[in-house]
Amino acid sequence: MSTTIRQVMVRGRVQGVGYRAWLAMTAEAQGLEGWVRNRRDGSVEALLAGRETVVAEMISRCRTGPSAAHVDEVIVEEAGQDALNLRYAGERFSILSTL
């Protein structure tokens, strides 16, 4: 099985609305690996790794997010395996500190 890895930047009203927790919980439930964090510019950044179809579905869900969020834009880029190293040891999916 080939692993697809995508870096996702989500802009809009996505901080202070539970977006990171929602993304981590939803991604883990789908069997994805990766991480999510707030950025100082008000966006949320995530790394999603797993089967291509599952990653694509998660990216689609990111365009809506939790009910309190208002997503204006989702930017998706390819990422390398080394980006997964930002996760905390022993975790499949981590909520990282703000960058």
Curated annotation (Swiss-Prot):
Active site, per annotation: 20, 38
SUPFAM superfamilies associated with the record: Acylphosphatase/BLUF domain-like
SS bond list: none
Keywords attached to this entry: Hydrolase
PROSITE patterns hit by this protein: ACYLPHOSPHATASE_2 (PS00151), ACYLPHOSPHATASE_3 (PS51160)
A Pfam family it matches: Acylphosphatase
Ranges where the Acylphosphatase-like domain occurs: 5-97
Tagged with keyword Ubl conjugation: no
InterPro entries registered for this protein in UniProt: Acylphosphatase (IPR020456), Acylphosphatase-like_dom (IPR001792), Acylphosphatase-like_dom_sf (IPR036046), Acylphosphatase_CS (IPR017968)
Catalysed reactions, as listed in the record: an acyl phosphate + H2O = a carboxylate + phosphate + H(+)
Protein EC: 3.6.1.7
Gene Ontology MF terms: acylphosphatase activity
Record-stated family: Belongs to the acylphosphatase family.
Protein name: Acylphosphatase
Annotated organism of origin: Rhodopseudomonas palustris (strain BisB5)
Gene that produces this protein: acyP
